[in-house]
C-alpha cells in the first residue's frame, strides 16, 4: 500500500548521487588553497559514489558493513551528513547541499510513515522478509 512508486526512489537516489558527485569533484579543486574543503570532498565522494552504485548492483558484503544504506532512516541521515559535507564552495555546492538536505529529511519522514514501502534494493540479499513485515508466525510455542 505504497503511495509513492518505487521508481521515484531510484530516480531520487541516482539524481542525488550524481549531483553530489559533481559537487564533491568541484571541491577537489581546493587542494592547494583549502585543504579542509579538499578532505571534505574526498569524504563526499566516498559517501556519494555508493549511492549511485547501489541502484544498479548490491554487493553482498556492503549490507554487513554499511547497513545504513539499506534503510530510509540511515539513508536520510547519510544524506543530511553528505549535504553538510558538500555545501562548501560555490553556489552550485550550496544548492546541491540544500537539495540533498531536503531529500534526507524526506527519507527520514518516509522511515516513520506507514504508507511508504521500502524499495527492493533495501532488502538484505537472501532474505524474504524486510524490516516492518508482519508476516512472521509468532505463536510463542515452546518445544
Swiss-Prot record:
Query: Where does this one sit in the cell?
Result: Golgi apparatus membrane
GO terms of biological process kind: vesicle-mediated transport
Task: Provide Lumenal-side residue ranges.
Answer: 32-35, 89
Additional note from the record? Present with 4540 molecules/cell in log phase SD medium.
List the keywords (alphabetical). Answer: Golgi apparatus, Membrane, Transmembrane, Transmembrane helix
- Can the keyword rRNA-binding be found in this entry's annotation? no
Q: What does this chain do?
A: Golgi membrane protein involved in vesicular trafficking.
GO CC annotation: Golgi membrane
A GO molecular function annotation here is: identical protein binding
| Keyword NAD annotated | no
Q: Which gene encodes it?
A: TVP15
* Membrane-spanning segments: 11-31, 36-56, 68-88, 90-110
Q: Name one Pfam family in it.
A: COPI_assoc
List the Cytoplasmic topological domains.
1-10, 57-67, 111-143
**Bilayer topology annotation:** Multi-pass membrane protein
Q: What is this protein called?
A: Golgi apparatus membrane protein TVP15
Q: Could you describe the subunit structure of this protein?
A: Interacts with TVP18.
Matching InterPro entries: Golgi_TVP15 (IPR013714)
Identify its protein family: Belongs to the TVP15 family.
